[in-house]
Amino acid sequence: MATIYIALVADVVASRGLPTAARARLQRRLLSAIPDFNRRWRKALAARFAVTLGDEFQCLLTSPAPIWEIAHVVRTTLGEVDWVIACGRGSLTTPLAAGRTAPELDGPCFHEARGALETAKRKHRLFGFGGFGAATTTLNAFASYYSALYWSWTPRQRRAAKLLRCGDPASVAAALKVSQSAVSHLARRMAWPLVSAGDSIFHAMLTDPHSPSAGPVS
């Protein structure tokens, strides 16, 4: 019997194109955010968040349930760049001891996540999935829809989308320094009710108890 986990790997889109000062600033902000991420999702973590490369980080989850929330908190907290969030489902080949961070571990779940990350980058997706059995194709189809919609928006609309996915209109208005009516107008132009409906289905695919999730398998 092997225990199945979800490895999550996040990386910045086109980070090498960032100016040196901007990339250094992002890396500092990421390092300062990691302790908050570990506190916020401590009950869902099999192994803690940690930075692997300069602007890439990993964590190991016991189930896929927090993926949606993690992705959108990251996109909002570190919203000056775009992030690819890749998830791989599988087992570990290294011992899992208390206090270990995700980059200290290895196994099929991480291989699946790494492959999903490379495919997502190649196909300009903001999500990538591997190892989820029959659900993998559907999850990546939703990732394609989500990403195509995002890239079709203007930079201002993209920022609004990040905020709307994590907050209410009042907080979005404060962040954008506009009125709530301006936020409503922007949301209408983005067909936000349809976007939200699509998001709900995508989210449900990740959290549905009947979908593949962490647990013992033979």
Report each predicted region and the residues it spans.
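Regulatory and interdomain segments flanking nucleotide-handling catalytic cores
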Residues: 1-218
